[in-house]
Amino acid sequence: LTADPEINVARVVSRVSDGGHDVPAEKIRSRYDKALALVKELIAVCDVCHIYDNSLSAPYRIFKKRKERCWYCTQRRLWHKEDIAALTGIKNAERAALNQKK
C-alpha cells in the first residue's frame, strides 16, 4: 500500500507517459479506499501477514502478524502507531525493527 492515493495517481501518470495504460484518477482513489477498508478483514483470516508501504522507491514493512502476535514499525514517520492501529484494527501490536537486514 501507499501512504496516500495521490502517489498511485502519480505513478499511473508516469506509466502512461511511458506508453502504459491509463486508469482514471477517481477510479484509483476509490479503489484505494476500498482496499484499505478490507485490510482488517484480511488480517483477521491470516495466520501470517506482512504489510508493506510502497510510497517510496523501496518497499518498507510497517506491520507483521504471526499467529496471535503482532508487530509494527514506525521508523519512516509516514506511519504512526495510531495509523497502523486504525488500518489493522490491532491496538496491542509491539514495536519492532521490522526492516533490518539479517
Name each region found by the language model:
Residues 1-36:
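A glycine- and Lys/Arg-enriched "phosphate-lid" helix/loop adjacent to the NTP-binding pocket
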Residues 37-41:
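A charged, well-structured terminal subsegment
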Residues 42-102:
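NTP-dependent small-molecule kinase module
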